[in-house]
Structure formats: C-alpha cells, structure tokens
Design a protein with these regions (language model features):
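Secreted/periplasmic carbohydrate-active enzymes, especially glycoside hydrolases
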Residues: 1-57, 66, 70-74, 132-133, ...
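Extracytoplasmic/secreted cell-surface and envelope-processing proteins
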Residues: 62-63, 83-85, 143-145, 462-463, ...
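A general beta-strand register signal
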Residues: 7, 415, 560, 714-716
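Mature N-terminal, pre-catalytic/accessory segment of carbohydrate-active enzymes
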Residues: 1, 394, 401-440, 444-446, ...
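Compositionally biased, intrinsically disordered or flexible polar/acidic segments
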Residues: 619-768
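Substrate-binding/catalytic cleft of secreted carbohydrate-active enzymes
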Residues: 39-47, 51-308
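Short alpha-beta junction capping motif
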Residues: 438-485, 563, 569, 587
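Catalytic beta-strand/loop cores that center a nucleophilic Ser/Cys/Thr
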Residues: 469-470, 486-579, 595-622
C-alpha cells in the first residue's frame, strides 16, 4: 500500500466494494458451491465492483475459488463484538445479545478462539490470490486494541502477502495497513454529500490519513418493498415481517401504491449513491468505498437497502450499465457548484476523469449539454492524457443560459471517445418570472383569514411548512431514513423520499420526475400531513412513509373547502431560492386555470386540527448551532462568584429536546468575572438521546486563568487527547455514531493530565 491507495502489482487501485452480511434466506447457511459464488461475483463485476467485505465472517473456500476466477478481491473477518452487545437492554429486549459477550482482551473464550481462527484462515485460504485483506472484525468498540494489535503483528510476520487491519470503524492503530471507517478520529467523516452541487470532495479529511482509508458502509438507503416479493421466501426464512407490514399498508389504504413508492424511493437511492461515489472518486487520497449494500438484508428487523433483493435479483431500480457510469475503473466526472440555475447565469463546470485502470488513455473527452428532447445546447471536446492511477483534470466549460425561455431539465453528458466510459448529470434552468397578479389568497396559517376566504368561495394557497402537530404530521427530509427503524428507532426522519404526480397540471411550470430529484433538495424543509382517514384524497406529492409505519402522507394536495378551493403546500415557498420561486409560480399558475377544480371535500374543523400552529421559542446560540437538540451554557444561572455543587438548575439550556435530559458528575461549578464552567479533575457527562441517531457533540473547554490545561477525553470508550490549551478556549468536536445512541444515551468522560482540572463552559449536540 501507498499512503493513500491499495496497490495491486504496484498499481493504485480504487477499491469499489460491497458488504456480504451472511444472508442466505432460502437455506440459512452460505453456499459451498463454486458456481453459485461465481454467479454472485459476476453480479459484482457487472456493477463495476472489484471487492467484497465479508462483514464479521469468513466465507467457505468455494467463495475464494470463485473470486480467483472472476477477479474479486476479498476482505475476510472473524466476528463482531461491540460495547452495546455487552449490556442488558431492558427497554429493548430484542437488542440484548445472548451471553452478553465482552470485548476481545476481556473475554477468555473469544481470546482463545479469535487468534486461532485467524491462523486457520490464512493456513486454509492464504494461497488464494483473491484473499487480499484480513480484518479481525466489525466495530470492535469494547475490545483491547493493544492485545488485538499483537495478534495482527504476528500474522503480518508469518504471512505478509495481504493487508491487515485490526477493526473497522473504531480506532486506527500502528499495525493497521489500511482502514475501513466512516470517521477518521479527530479528523472527520469519510463520506457524505456536502454542498448543493458536485463541486465537492473529502480531500481535507482523507489527506490527513497515513494509510489507505476505505469509506465504511456507504449508503444504507432503504427502498419501499414490492409486496409480491413475499412469495419468494420459500425456504428457511419466512417473510412474516413483510406480511405484517403489508397489513398496515392495507389498513391505511396504500397497499396498491407499492410500485409507485418502490420506483420513487429507488430512484432517490440511485441519485444518492451516484453522488456519494462520485464525491469519493473526486477525492485523490480516498482508497475506495464499501457499500451497505447492493442487496437487501432481512436481519435486524429488515433493512431493504439494496437495488437487488435478498436473492440477488434486480428490483428494477438501476441496470448494471447505468451503475457502471460512476462505478468503474475509469469514470468521467463533472464539478459544478449547484444543480439549479437561472437564465441570467452562466453554467460552469470542470471536467475530470478518474482513471484507475492499468492504461493511460490518449483520446478526446467530449461533453454535451442537451435538453430533455435531445436538442443540443452546446458541446466541447478536449484531448489530454488520462493518466492511470489518478484523478485527471481535463477541461472547463461555460454555457450562456440566456437564450433559454422556459423552465427545463438539461443533461450534461461526458464521454471518452472510442470507449464505453460515459457519465451524465441533470441540471435545472429557470427563467425569471413575475408572480401572476391574482386574487388568490396566499397565507401561512389556517386562521380566520383563510377560513373567511374559503367560505366566500375564494382560492387559497396555504404555505403549510410550519403547520401541524406531531400526531398528524411528519417533517420533510430529502434523504431517506437510515438503514431500518427496527434497528435504529429514534430517527425523526420516517420517510423514503416522495412520489410525485409529475403529469399533474400543478407542475406545468415546474419540470419534475416522479421522485424527488436534486432540485427538490433546496426546498425540502417543511411538513407532510397524515391523511389515513382520507382514502379518496389523491396527493399531488405524496412522501413515502417508512414501510414500518405505512402512513398515507401528503405534502402538496388540493381540496374543496366550504365554497372555496384550497391548495396546500408543505414545502417552504418563501425561501430565497430559484426552486422555491419556480414552484410557487407553477402552483399559482395552475390555480388561475379552469382545471383547478378539486373534487374532494374536507371540513374546516378537520383542517383546523390538521394545520395547527405552534409558535417557535426564540433561542440565542452561536452561529452554526441553531440545529442543536441540546445546547447548554454550563452554570450560567449561578449568581454568586465562587464554586457550587453541580445541579441542572444552575445551567442554562438554550435548546433542549424533550428527550435530551442530562446529568453531570464534576467537582463543582465555578464562576468568576470571566464566566462560568463545570470543573473537575475527572468529569462524566451523561446525555439521554433519541435512540439510534447520529451527530456531533461539541464541547467548549476553557483555560481563562492560564493553567495550561490538558487532558484525555473518552466518548463511549473512544479516547482522544485535549492538547495544552495555553490559556485559550477550545471547541472539541466528537463524532457520535448510531451505535453510541442505540441505548438512548451517550457518555463523555474527561480526565485531567495537566493544569489541575478541566473546565467546560458550553456543550452542544447536533443531530445529523
């Protein structure tokens, strides 16, 4: 390996992988048939993948033999033990692991088995060229890394033919030759889509690593199921869970919409995977990615996150040819800073090519910009050497958009001439419009103004993004929920994108597909409303409810109210955004037409309950912390200078989600003319959280009396160093994983190394 890449025959390779989670629903055990593994690995290759991570298990020899033949690299492992498996979960008994296994180094039976099993693995399969990576196991958070490092060093000395790592996603040790993780300690996350376009990467994070880092468990975007898949479970595993979920869909009158929801959530998954993978390909120091996963997983409740089902059959979401556009040895890339443009702007983009093949290409790279009918707007071509093993800068383009007169979707295509390598991106272009002068009432509350207008037979556009209560509405999100609410039940996001009636005349001036493509991301702030009691109401935009819930939802819908006509929009139309303005224009344009004639009636009293308004409390927090679910000014309510025992009544909680209670063990609270802080040689902060959420804990350490404070921090057992503060304040950002909050709490411990004690003046938890 080099500093940032895994080398095969001394050539940098971008690792494109998928997780195999030991899931065989027909038999209940892994196949030992070479042909079956050849079938599976041929599917890998068809989607442009080159390796597999066997999550916490080692496959039989048939898999290694098939991988040798097909050309797939293997990462094999032994087990998975994390801290949450070692505790009794009274509130969630299904999460209590049998035997409550302790971590390696603290578990005599496992401490004997694991090094022996590692040795057996390399003795049995070590001669297979596909066996390129070995890791002890998955997320070994409560294990002794010093002891595990000794095991790995012994293997490296005995058989240096492959790369070795101790654990995924917890801690990087000196013996690690590569790392699979979603977070580099004290540095940042290894994947995610930042920004509103494609002009982004994660080089600022990966460049700080000193070994190749592969993004861990990328994706985990669920797709709504097709109920006829239940019939495929004819073996060891019965789909009783899906049968139960289907009955909930029947109850709420949405069973027949499964294909629409499947297509819409699947299309959203596709653009998100494309965005994530290209972001990593644009990152020169990234070693690759491992997806979770291309297939559904029927464990942990069920995580229907694949574009293939649990039987390796296509779900009709994306073809191998389409996926290889951005998952291949050679991938054309485009950098532009936003997806939505106005006609008084110039569309600009940078063209790159990631080439991780074994050949330098010298051939023209061609780009075109076309509309949805294929009409060419502009094109260009440039020939530069596309060097192997790097991301190549190829060309830049500028397209004047001023001749476009109507809103439209446009395609940027980049093709490497004479090769199969091609990629495509969508952008949306909107001309400037003055809102139509109408007598339509536009209002953001369902109050006497709206009711009076409807009773008089007027038309009303209700901008409802701030309306609704918890029991009759749900927040809107662009991305789907994570993995599965069976396993991570505390998520506030309970949707999988939205199905859009794209042919509806409300969208005549707002080009859209039948799913939420990138232009919707700008405005996906607001509410959708639960309409289970309205089976005959057909939403214009229907968010896809998590199949564990199966509510019938509506974020844009129309109805007849008294003598009037009401169009409801749960998206924020008041944003300073071309997308918000264009959608508002399109809705108003529709409302001026004769075909705005809703037939479904809803009573005023019903709408009063649906559109209840709760004023937001005003908060004062530093910029960047507005979205905290907990923000504490430590000891701010203390009146007199000096020290006092900690009590929550002396803190000031600027923001506090009702689920985020906390307690602090410290020496005291201190107050002087410089401020207030929790202080202690050793402190413990325990924060209750919604279960299964992910985020960042920000802690502000003080040293205003110049004691050169320094210490050791431990968040859920992961240690980091607080360096000498030298009299300065210091914000520390600590990554919180979903597994950390799966027991409904996080625990931060601090230990003073220098300066007498540590001081914490503010603490904030921001949920991602």
């Amino acid at each position: 390996a080099s500093r940032s890449k895994i080398l095969i025959n001394n050539r940098p390779v971008f690792m494109r992988g998928n997780l195999d989670c030991l899931h065989f629903p027909l038999t209940g055990y892994p196949s030992c048939d070479i042909q079956e593994w050849e079938r599976i690995f041929s599917i890998y290759k068809s989607y442009g993948l080159n390796h597999v991570r066997f999550h916490s298990w080692c496959p039989p020899e048939a898999a290694f033999t098939a991988a040798d033949r097909i050309g797939i690299y293997i990462q094999a492992e032994v087990l998975w033990i994390d801290w949450w498996m070692s505790v009794v979960r009274k509130e969630r008994p299904e999460m209590t692991t049998r035997g409550l296994p302790k971590g390696l180094g603290h578990n005599p039976s496992a401490d004997k088995f694991v090094p022996e099993e590692l040795q057996r693995m390399i003795e049995a399969y070590g001669n297979h060229p596909s066996f390129t990576m070995l890791c002890i196991g998955n997320e070994l958070g409560n294990s002794n890394f010093d002891i595990m490092q000794q095991w790995i060093k012994s293997l490296q000395e005995k058989d240096p033919r492959r790369l070795y790592a101790i654990s995924t996603a917890r801690k990087i040790m000196p013996a690690d030759q590569y790392m699979v993780t979603h977070n580099i300690p004290q540095t940042g996350g290894t994947y995610g889509i930042n920004g509103s376009g494609t002009d982004n990467d994660r080089e600022s994070i990966y460049s700080k690593a000193t070994i190749p880092v592969i993004a861990h468990e990328v994706g985990q975007y669920p797709v709504y199921p097709l109920w006829n898949e239940i019939d495929k479970y004819t073996g060891a595993l019965e789909a009783r869970n899906l049968e139960s979920l289907r009955q909930q869909a029947v109850k709420n009158h949405i069973e027949h919409q499964d294909r629409k929801f499947h297509e819409a959530s699947g299309a959203l998954q596709t653009i998100l995977y494309k965005g994530l993978i290209e972001n990593l390909l644009r990152t020169p120091s990234c070693a690759g990615f491992q997806m979770l996963s291309m297939t559904d997983y029927s464990g942990q409740g069920e995580a229907l996150v694949g574009w293939l089902d649990s039987f390796w059959d296509s779900k009709g979401i994306i073809t191998p040819e389409q996926f290889r556009c951005y998952s291949n040895d050679i991938v054309p890339l485009a950098r532009f800073h936003k997806y939505t443009w106005q006609t008084d702007e110039t569309f600009k983009a940078q063209i790159q090519v990631a080439n991780y093949s074994d050949t330098t290409l010298i051939t023209p790279t061609i780009w075109t910009l076309t509309d949805e009918t294929g009409k060419l707007q502009q094109q260009g071509s440039r020939e530069v050497p596309l060097s192997s093993g790097k991301v190549n800068q190829v060309d830049s383009l500028s397209v004047d958009l001023s001749e476009i007169t109507s809103p439209g979707k446009y395609y940027l295509d980049v093709t490497i001439s004479g090769t199969p390598y091609h990629n495509r991106w969508s952008i949306w272009v909107y001309p400037p419009y003055n809102m139509p002068q109408t007598n339509i009432i536009i209002h953001d509350k369902f109050d006497s103004t709206v009711i009076s207008a409807l009773e008089q037979g007027k038309k009303v556009l209700l901008v409802a993004d701030q309306l609704g209560k918890k029991d009759n509405s749900t927040p809107l999100y662009f991305t789907p929920l994570f993995w599965s609410t069976s396993f991570f039940p505390g998520q506030s996001n309970t949707t999988l994108g939205a199905w859009i009636d794209k042919a509806h005349p409300a969208f005549s001036q707002f080009p859209t597909d039948n799913y939420t493509d990138w232009q919707w991301k700008e405005i996906t702030q607001g509410r959708s409303f639960i309409i289970n009691e309205h089976p005959q109401l057909h939403p214009i935009v229907q968010p896809v409810s998590d199949f564990h819930i199966n509510d019938k939802l509506a974020s844009i819908f129309e109805c007849k109210v008294s003598k009037g006509k009401l169009l409801v929009c749960g998206y924020n139309l008041n944003l300073d955004s071309p997308v918000a303005r264009q959608l508002k224009y399109s809705l108003l344009h529709y409302m001026t037409q004769s075909n705005f004639n809703p037939s479904y009636s809803i009573k005023i009293d019903t709408l009063k309950k649906m559109f209840a308004y709760t004023p937001k409390a005003m908060v004062s927090v530093p910029k960047g912390f507005e979205n905290s679910i907990l923000y504490i000014s430590c000891g701010k309510q203390m009146k007199n200078s000096g020290s006092a025992p900690w009590t929550a009544t002396l803190d000031h909680t600027e923001i506090q989600d009702e689920r985020c209670k906390y307690k602090v063990t410290c020496d005291n609270i201190w107050k002087d003319e410089k401020g207030t802080a929790w202080t202690g040689k050793n402190m413990t902060i325990e924060i209750q959280t919604p279960e299964g959420i992910i985020g960042d804990l920000y802690v502000k350490f003080e040293d205003w009396n110049h004691q050169n404070r320094a210490g050791l921090l431990s968040i859920e057992g992961r240690e980091s160093i607080l360096e000498n503060q030298k009299g300065k304040e210091r914000w520390v950002k600590l990554f919180i994983m979903r597994e950390d909050t799966n027991d409904g709490k996080i625990v931060l411990k601090t230990h003073t190394k220098q300066g007498g004690n540590l001081m914490i003046s503010q603490i904030a938890f921001i949920k991602q």
